[in-house]
């Protein structure tokens, strides 16, 4: 028994079916079937854990609010206290290219509501949930906040985001870097041929818009694949590759293309067929006068064929040495990718 049979003879899904949700950039259901019995639970659980814990994303690390020394303060004219504001800031969804850290600023006067859409971003930082409410200002109130944004993975508690040399007034924020918000999966029986107990894995995924659900699963699968490589302690035997020797031709390989593959009108195609013109090599050797002597073949059909040939860099009245070759049907099959 060859070692490849350990994995080559297991059934695998033909493709991943993606069912978009109301917002395809955030919601989707992915279905993989058929899987060997037990593999649905194995893969579903592993992918779910990776999706929630290991994908890279961006989040707010800390915030500085003008006039505020610590998170247990209150701000005149602002209805929420600083603790509630910080909790709202934690929910800001961000997409960012590069590592960071980068800065964002919001400055607003009341009355009104400060939302994530009021934040002034720079460069490649994008706020994904602009409708998120951060705080509410009374008439005459003013607030200015500066955010530090960085990239990371998983969840990082606020205390770990506090630098050792943190200046007074810098408030660390819990950072939820993962772009995946929710993942659920279920495993059902599915049929393949006469076998009824294969697995069908259905995963429902919600992201913050920083990555599509389909891409999130692809990244998670790649992480899992990379982690498993260390357990493979052998190299697969290499397959012998036989290279087909293609003979040199004395003419353009395009001459081996059949005329019925050209986009011709029915009338023109029938005229060529009735005149036993099968290949382009047969056609280009004909002169205009010869073509016009073909029954039911008129000037309109002639112009059509001349135009099609011109698009291929060919014309009527060409000399084709060595035409027709003895094994023309075999050559046409071997050269079909060369014209």
Curated annotation (Swiss-Prot):
The gene is rpoA. GO terms for cellular component: cytoplasm; DNA-directed RNA polymerase complex. It comes from Nitrobacter winogradskyi (strain ATCC 25391 / DSM 10237 / CIP 104748 / NCIMB 11846 / Nb-255). Residues 1-235 are annotated as: Alpha N-terminal domain (alpha-NTD). This is DNA-directed RNA polymerase subunit alpha. One of its GO terms (molecular function) is DNA-directed RNA polymerase activity. HAMAP family: RNApol_bact_RpoA (MF_00059). Its EC number is 2.7.7.6. It comes from the Bacteria. SMART domains: RPOLD. The keyword Cell division does not apply. The N-terminal domain is essential for RNAP assembly and basal transcription, whereas the C-terminal domain is involved in interaction with transcriptional regulators and with upstream promoter elements. It catalyses: RNA(n) + a ribonucleoside 5'-triphosphate = RNA(n+1) + diphosphate. Residues 251-339 are annotated as: Alpha C-terminal domain (alpha-CTD). Belongs to the RNA polymerase alpha chain family. SUPFAM superfamilies: C-terminal domain of RNA polymerase alpha subunit, Insert subdomain of RNA polymerase alpha subunit, RBP11-like subunits of RNA polymerase. Homodimer. The RNAP catalytic core consists of 2 alpha, 1 beta, 1 beta' and 1 omega subunit. When a sigma factor is associated with the core the holoenzyme is formed, which can initiate transcription. Keywords: DNA-directed RNA polymerase, Nucleotidyltransferase, Transcription, Transferase.
């Amino acid at each position: 028994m060859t070692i490849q049979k350990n994995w080559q003879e297991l059934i695998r899904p033909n493709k991943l079916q993606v069912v978009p949700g109301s917002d395809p950039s955030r919601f989707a259901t992915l279905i993989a079937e058929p899987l060997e019995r037990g593999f649905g639970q194995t893969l579903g659980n592993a992918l779910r854990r990776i999706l929630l814990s290991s994908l890279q994303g961006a989040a707010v690390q800390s915030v500085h609010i003008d006039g505020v020394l610590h998170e247990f303060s209150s701000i005149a004219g602002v209805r929420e206290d600083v603790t509630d504001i910080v909790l709202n800031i934690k929910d800001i969804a961000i997409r960012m290219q590069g590592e960071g850290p980068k800065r964002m600023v919001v400055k607003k006067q009341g009355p009104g509501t400060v939302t994530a859409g009021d934040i002034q971003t720079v460069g490649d930082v994008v706020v994904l949930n602009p409708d998120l409410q951060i705080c509410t200002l009374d008439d005459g109130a003013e607030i200015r906040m500066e955010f530090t944004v960085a990239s990371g993975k998983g969840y990082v508690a606020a205390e770990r985001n506090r630098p050792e040399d943190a200046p007074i007034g810098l408030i660390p924020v819990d950072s939820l870097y993962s772009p995946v918000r929710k993942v659920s999966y279920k495993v059902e029986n599915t049929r393949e041929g006469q076998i009824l107990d294969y697995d069908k894995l259905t995963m429902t995924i919600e992201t913050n818009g920083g990555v599509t659900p389909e891409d999130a699963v692809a990244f998670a699968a790649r992480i899992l694949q990379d982690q498993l490589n260390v357990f493979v302690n052998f190299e697969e035997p290499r397959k012998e590759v036989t290279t087909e020797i293609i003979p040199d031709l004395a003419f353009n390989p395009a001459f081996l293309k059949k005329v019925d593959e050209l986009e011709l009108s029915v009338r023109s195609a029938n005229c060529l067929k009735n005149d036993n013109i099968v290949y382009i090599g047969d056609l280009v050797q004909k002169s205009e006068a010869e073509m016009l002597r073909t029954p039911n073949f008129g000037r309109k059909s002639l112009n059509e064929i001349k135009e099609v040939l011109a698009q291929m860099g060919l014309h009527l009245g060409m000399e084709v040495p060595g035409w027709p070759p003895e094994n023309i049907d075999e050559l046409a099959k071997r050269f079909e990718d060369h014209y």
